[in-house]
Amino acid sequence: DTVEDVRKGLPSASAFGRLALCPGSFTMEKSCPDESSEAAAEGTLLHRYMEYLLLKDDAAEEGMEFSWHDFLNSREYESAELNHEQVELCGRALRLLNGVKEKILDYPDAFFSLVSTEERRFLSDWIEGGEYSGQWDALFRVGSDLLVLDWKFGRVAVDSAEANRQLEALVPLAAQKANEEGIIYNGIYAAIIQPRVAGPASVTFYDDEAISQAEQDSLAVARAAMDPDAP
């Protein structure tokens, strides 16, 4: 499927940092085909490998195992290999994730489990208007909370978790999934892991009030972007 098909022609959380500043860029973006680049291709490969590592660890707890190529075949992805630097980079990403766990868990043996990976969801406001989609890289249950996670493999630091519009838009989608599936949670942590950027992962926390505000703010961004007269 093309990006347009997957997103159903709606604004996507990954662009919310830009759309919040320039709503009209959504219409311009739709009229211009996506340009592939070496960096984008590497980003896709690294995201797939991280998904594989998370699912592999999850399966190992159930006594199952599968290879990288088994994973690629199951997703109908083209065969691909990582070089040594890329494998090391993904290892660093996992270590940064462990740092996030240690930061937010009250005690070492607290409940931590994978809920889903690379899941795209949609959120709509049928009263005020506005609709968007977003895809997290991973969603976890962490003790009595949730953790929504985004990997960034670029060499330039992105906005901190607290100021990140993409994460802000993903949080209501995580809450939506939890509510639909009966997952009880007190709040939602949101984290950005950037293994090519120095320092620990960036983490923030949303309580119920902040989750509701994030939903309103994100739908407002989508609403403005979908306005045909947006500047």
Set out the residue ranges of the language-model regions.
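Cysteine-cluster motifs in flexible loop/terminal segments that predominantly coordinate metals
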Residues: 20-26, 224-231
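Metal-dependent nuclease catalytic cores that hydrolyze phosphodiester bonds in DNA/RNA
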Residues: 1-145, 187-189
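Mg2+/Mn2+-dependent nuclease catalytic core
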Residues: 110-229
